[in-house]
Amino acid sequence: MSNLIIRPAIEDDAEELAELLNEIIRIGGTTAYQSVMDKGDIIRDFVRSKWLLSCFVAEMEGKVVGFQHLDAADPEYSGPFKLGAGWSVIASFVRVDHHGQGIGRRLFQETKTAAKQAGSFAIDATIRADNTLGIAFYQNLGFRTYVTIEDVPLSDGTRMDRVRKKYDLTVEE
């Protein structure tokens, strides 16, 4: 995959990122997001999010084939997914027709560096329990399950467990 370029996301990527994420949302079952997003949503929630540490895109032959977003844990959040200072939160998305090609792993190399540079000691990945591909992806990167939160409502009211995985940045590889 020598023609894969990993670079920081910019606002001009937002339309392609929305297209990529919306395809995943429409298929269903692999993201907690259930409502399609437009360019403005992508800029607000990923490219320029309030607690942004990094957002990287994977580009192949001029086309975005994946992106990975990392926020610092939101100190204002008080819900069931509350994390303390020093934690960061990851979200990863790869075009369905590009799964299994190492794109997420390449993105994570950059994301992990950004997390360390920001002073994070751990990265959280919160994954729907029915997303077996996502659970395996994070497990293969070195994330380990630290808690399962049961019966969390999705935006449509469906109840779903969430598996929380932690990547410990304090352990040398």
Regions found by a protein language model. Name each.
Residues 115-127:
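Conserved GNAT acetyl-CoA-binding A-motif
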Residues 18, 22-45:
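Conserved GNAT-fold acetyl-CoA-binding loop/helix
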Residues 71-77, 124-127, 139, 144-161:
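Conserved catalytic-core motifs of GNAT/GCN5-like acyltransferases
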Residues 5-17:
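A short beta-loop-alpha structural element at the N-terminal edge
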Residues 50, 86, 119, 159-161:
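Residue-level preference for beta-strand/loop junctions
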